[in-house]
């Protein structure tokens, strides 16, 4: 959610900090600020609102900075309303900090500090940490930080400055991600690589419970006992162009158009000898044969990808699969055992609820497989097995290509599970893989012809509410389509299993209400068409997403969206593209900030 940056080097740092913060805008925020060493003091500038209208405008009225070290922050309000006073950095002149996460025991800390004579100005939990650092300060910043974080409960990452230690910045974390970037004669801290990729591709992952002491010459890592930790340098595999729009109006549109390539990068390395291969992570056929239950856990779009996985695994492997929302999984006392497999899906690898679900599964002894996009992320490190989707950075808050490759992984897993359990033979598995390998070209056809999606979007922009319906795999897909639309167009939408309409929801249908029907499954087509007729009779405006060979009465469908033919089982990978583009163009026609929808954050690192 919030974004942290920091710099120490030879260059004037204000512009670097602000530029790095702009790279973290996709994470979501409501205020921003920086703190830098100026002379013998720490200078802080912060403002409510977006960077351009808030912090950057405020900095234009400030005297020229000469500082070469500082920290910065974009805040997503959790404790205290969005305001200048609640913005970060927060400190008292001697200490300044930026903070991502939630301090669960901040009230207790605050009461203690008030008893010691400290006053509080903001409504934030962050201020309790800043004042506790000041209270514990003994001249040694590492000792001070270790004593302080030992008393903090919750998930957090911190960037810290001490007035008496110029040209040094410090970092610490528990759960919430933070990296330390290594440049030439300069060092950085950041919530993720996107913030610093313009300056360096080399970085260290800060481990939970570790403290980093950073100067222009390098970094020293300490554990909670002040022992020095040796860290391996990581190298980002993508370049700065991947984090730029490249001529597209929005990152979301760019990322939708990148999906054919993202699919190839995810699918091709996992095929060996024409068969899906999971040997790199240790997921053997013997394991797949012996798992008693398979659980798939995720949030939002990741959970929807898991729903596709459930349908496909059950259909091919005849193995029961449970799909759970991560925030529910850990609290419902799941019936897990050591012979169960829990598949954890997360784009960032830092989603707090999903990480907590993973830790629960590990604690019970179940096998865990993480499907993530970010190498070295918390979920990747915590899981017993991990597979990377290799989709490249996804900047838009609204997930598109990450969902696509997560769903593709579900197919690869389903094929291997079915083969390992002798539900399909080798020839059948090879045929499925062959057809899956053709999906990128079919997705490309959907991406190339966007006029039909724009036409549909122009009819949706005035809607107050709409429904998505489908059956089987189409229902799983309708859930994702509905989420995309509501996320960025702010139009209320719900997805329903088409057969459930008559059990109550059909009472909502009135003249002109849009209903988007996903109907790609030939064996369910007639049933879905009967539901389409039901809503059409009651005045609905019907958009139908279907394969190009499907026949229908023009009186029943107002706006058909025709798709390239593929095996029914694989159609979710094709049909999701029109749903993404319909949502995109609806929001764009309404002149909304497509990449940064209100109240949403890209990486939800708090529970």
Language-model regions, residue ranges each:
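Extended hydrophobic-aromatic, low-complexity segments
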Residues: 181, 305-306, 322-323, 352-355, ...
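Glycine-rich oxoanion-binding loops at beta->alpha junctions
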Residues: 68-85, 272-285, 309-345, 351, ...
């Amino acid at each position: 959610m919030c974004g942290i940056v920091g710099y120490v080097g030879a260059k004037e740092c204000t512009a670097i900090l602000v530029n790095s913060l702009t790279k973290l805008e996709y994470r979501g925020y409501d205020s921003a600020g920086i703190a830098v060493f100026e002379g013998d003091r720490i200078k802080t500038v912060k403002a409510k609102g977006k960077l351009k209208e808030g912090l950057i405008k405020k900095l234009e009225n400030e005297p020229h900075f000469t500082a070469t070290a500082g920290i910065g922050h974009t805040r997503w309000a959790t404790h205290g309303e969005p305001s200048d006073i609640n913005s970060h950095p927060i400190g008292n002149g001697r200490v300044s900090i930026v903070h991502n996460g939630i301090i669960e025991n901040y009230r207790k800390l605050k009461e203690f500090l008030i008893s010691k004579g400290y006053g509080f100005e903001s409504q934030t939990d962050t201020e309790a940490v800043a004042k506790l650092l000041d209270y514990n300060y003994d001249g040694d910043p590492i000792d001070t930080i270790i004593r302080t974080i030992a008393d903090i409960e919750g998930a957090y990452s911190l960037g810290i400055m001490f007035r008496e230690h110029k040209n040094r910045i410090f970092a610490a974390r528990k759960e919430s991600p933070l990296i330390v970037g290594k440049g030439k004669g300069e060092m950085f801290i950041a919530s993720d690589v996107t913030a610093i990729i313009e300056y360096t591709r080399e970085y260290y992952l800060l481990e939970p419970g570790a403290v980093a002491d950073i100067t222009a010459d390098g970094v020293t890592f300490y554990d909670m006992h002040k022992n020095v930790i040796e860290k391996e340098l990581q190298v980002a595999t993508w370049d700065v162009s991947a984090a730029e729009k490249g001529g597209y109006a929005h990152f979301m549109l760019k990322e939708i158009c990148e999906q054919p390539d993202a699919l190839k990068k995810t699918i091709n390395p996992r095929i060996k000898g024409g068969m899906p291969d999971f040997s790199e992570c240790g997921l053997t056929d013997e394991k797949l044969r012996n798992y008693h239950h398979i659980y798939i856990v995720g949030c939002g779009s990741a959970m929807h990808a898991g729903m596709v996985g459930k349908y496909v695994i059950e259909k091919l492997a005849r193995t029961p699969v449970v799909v759970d929302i991560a925030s529910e999984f850990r609290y419902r006392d799941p019936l897990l055992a050591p012979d169960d497999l829990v598949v954890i899906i997360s784009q960032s690898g830092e989603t707090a609820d999903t990480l907590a679900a993973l830790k629960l599964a590990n604690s019970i002894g179940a096998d865990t497989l993480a499907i993530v996009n970010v190498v070295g992320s918390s979920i990747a490190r915590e899981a017993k097995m991990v597979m990377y989707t290799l989709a490249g950075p996804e900047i838009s808050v609204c997930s598109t290509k990450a969902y696509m490759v997560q769903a593709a992984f579900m197919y690869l897993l389903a094929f291997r599970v079915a083969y390992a359990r002798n539900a399909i033979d080798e020839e059948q598995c090879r045929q499925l893989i062959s057809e899956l390998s053709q999906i990128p070209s079919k997705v490309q056809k959907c991406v190339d012809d966007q006029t039909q999606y724009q036409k549909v979007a122009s009819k949706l922009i005035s809607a107050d509410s709409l429904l998505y319906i489908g059956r089987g795999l189409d229902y799983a897909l309708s859930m994702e389509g509905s989420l995309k639309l509501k996320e960025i167009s702010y139009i209320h939408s719900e997805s329903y299993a088409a057969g459930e309409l008559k059990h109550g929801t059909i009472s909502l249908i009135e003249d002109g209400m849009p209903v988007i029907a996903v109907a790609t499954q030939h064996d369910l087509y007639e049933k879905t068409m009967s539901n389409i007729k039901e809503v059409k009779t009651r005045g609905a405006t019907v958009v139908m997403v279907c394969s190009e060979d499907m026949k229908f009465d023009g009186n029943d469908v107002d706006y058909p969206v025709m798709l390239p033919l593929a095996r029914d089982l694989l159609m979710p990978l094709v049909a999701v593209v029109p749903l993404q583009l319909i949502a995109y163009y609806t929001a764009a026609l309404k002149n909304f900030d497509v990449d940064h929808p209100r109240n949403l954050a890209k990486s939800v690192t708090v529970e």
